[in-house]
Structure formats: structure tokens, C-alpha cells
Amino acid sequence: MDALATSINQFALELSKKLAESAQGKNIFFSAWSISASLAMVHLGAKGNTAAQMAQVLQFKRDQGVKSDPESEKKRKTEFNLSNSGEIHCNFQTLISEILKPNNDYILKTANAAYSEKTYPFHNKYLEDVKTYFGAEPQSVNFVEASDQIRKEINSWVERQTEGKIQNLLSDDSVGSTTRMVLVNALYFKGIWEHQFLVQNTTEKPFRINETTSKPVQMMFMKEKLQIFHIEKPQALGLQLYYKSCDLSLFILLPEDINGLEQLEKAITYEKLSKWTSADMMEVYDVQLHLPKFKLEESYDLKSTLSSMGMSDAFSESEADFSGMSSARNLFLSNVFHKAFVEIDEQGTEAAAGSGSEISFRIKVPSIEFNANHPFLFFIRHNKTNNILFYGRFCSP
């Protein structure tokens, strides 16, 4: 499962860079883990070059064409060994079970499904395998005659699965009579902090979008012993903030320079991120933390993004090979829709009142101010599996 976590985290960074190309000055928030699981469900029925391209984009296997730090190439070759399709999907089965295990300390609601035009029926074996490995049931629907009704039904299903938090995933023109197959993928997350933000400490403060522009935000504040890490090139400060029970952590990467976000995004690699956030790089500080209260709800139509990353055959009527999924010819992936929702606020710590003293340090630790009052990167990690569940940037309140 370690190799799969590495693959998903690498995919998260590659996807974030690709999304950033067309989202200058905009917030980004997505779940690479969930997108990867959705695409792996389709990869299960892919054959030939279609399967090979998907495996490459999802980082299931590496080649010389993928940029990497030279000093870590040898290590990579031992880590990325998911060349066996069965191994990939067994690993996903274990991972999904671990991440979605019932938990009272955070809410993680997912909606993950494939919908295919009913004239392209699925193989029974494929349906069985998808249910076994991914806990999902691909649906055969009537896009040809009732695409708008199907769209509404999909939206209703997603809304139910996410307890009403994610609505209208598919817009009016997102599917039509020529749609063959779509992937829908939506997540809602709300966590409970290990250490509390007090509501009375939240005040309106300026968030500096750049050197000349700022917007008011509700800035939360806490003073607590937290784990800090330093990034030298480019200069940035990192912080780990645990959710209750420490199953999950929020990591924030804050450039020293107000305009330093783009430089940090370009510099980041999987190897660097792993090094920066490793336990031996963390130091405990007495932190004065200023963190904006925010809510992000981002939607993505990923067809062009994934195609440009290298899996174009899956979206091509003439090139796609999904013969492991259906015996009907010309089945291809029409689109991949993704929506993720997160809230970062004080409310998450209501149930954690009094937990601030659970960890005590008798030795004096250095103090530091961590003021997230300008654009930063952040991600939420599932600590047991080392998986990045969500990845984002906050630059526009």
C-alpha cells in the first residue's frame, strides 16, 4: 500500500500544477486520492494503450519521461512497482476501507460512480470486480433519450451521498445524447481540531492577495505548541495541525514572500514534500497561529486536464479500449467530473474543548509567529496511510 500512497501523492502534485496553469489567481481544491480511485475503477476495464496511458498518468508506473530529482531516481524505481493490475486494485480496496472507516472525529462523505450509456452493457465480471475492489456499482443509463433526466438523477444521488453538502455537480450542458460514459466524483470533509480555536479570538484582518491588494477575512487565532518545519528553497514556513485523534493532519506551506506562491508551486516535487514533512524535519514551537476561516467548494471538468497529462486515448472514440469493461465497440470516457468541499473554521473544535493540555512539554521551546495572511498551499493527509486526501491553494478569499 506504500507504493500506492506514493503514486497518489505524486499524482496530486502533477495534477495541482496542471490545474494551476489555467487558474492563475484562483483557489484550487481537489481530492487526488478520490480522483485516482475513480480513474482506477475505469482502469480496471481498460486494455492496451488506453490502460498504459492511464497507469502512467496515475503514476502506477514510471518511465524516463517523467521528471524527477536525479538523486532520488534509484529510490523511485523501488517504490513504483505497481505494474500488476491486480495488485493496484487490491491496494485500492485496502486503502479505501482504511480511509472510509467509520470515525467520530471527522466527517468524510464521498460519491463515486461511473455511468455508461445502456447500449454499451458492462461485463458481469467487471461489475463484480468494481464492487469488490471499490465498493461501487457502475450504472447503465439512457443518455440517448433522457440525458437531462439522468443528469438530475445523478445530481440527486451525489447530494444524498454527501448529506446535502454537494449540489448540482453536473451543470445543464454537461451530458447529452452523445454521452457514452462519465465519471462523477464528489467529496465533503469536516474535521474536529485536536487543539481548539476559540471563537472569541477570531477577528477581521486583511488577507494580502499581493503587495497592493488585500481583502478582509475572519482570522482565527490560537497560541499552542505545534509542529513547524522550515523550507529553504524557496523560503517558506510549514505547519502541521492535527485533527482530533491525530488520524488526519492539515499541513500549511506559507511562502515567506507575499508573491512567493508561484515559485513554491513550481519548486515542489514529491521527494521534496516528503522530506519537508517528515518527522525528523519537524520541530515543536510555541506558535502564535493566525489562520483564515474559509470554505472552499471547487468543481472541475477534468477531461482536457487529464488528456493533456497523457491519457488522451481514454477520451477518444476511435482510440479508447475498454474491452475489459464491455464488449460493445466505441465505448469511451466522455468526461470526468469532480467536486470537493471543505470548511476550515473554529466550529470543528467544539468537541475538543480542553484537549489543548493533552500534550505537555516541560522543556522550554522556541516561539514563532505563523501568520497565514497571504497566499499559501495546504493539504490534508491521512497519517496512517500517508495519503494526501485533499490538496489546495488559498489565494483569493
From Swiss-Prot:
Pfam families: Serpin (PF00079). Coiled coil: none annotated. InterPro entries: Serpin_CS (IPR023795), Serpin_dom (IPR023796), Serpin_fam (IPR000215), Serpin_sf (IPR036186), Serpin_sf_1 (IPR042178), Serpin_sf_2 (IPR042185). Gene3D superfamilies: Alpha-1-antitrypsin, domain 1, Antithrombin, subunit I, domain 2. A motif (Nuclear localization signal) lies at residues 74-77. SUPFAM superfamilies: Serpins. It is found in: Nucleus; Cytoplasm. Protease inhibitor that may play a role in the regulation of protease activities during hematopoiesis and apoptosis induced by TNF. May regulate protease activities in the cytoplasm and in the nucleus. Belongs to the serpin family. Ov-serpin subfamily. This is Serpin B10. It comes from Plecturocebus moloch.
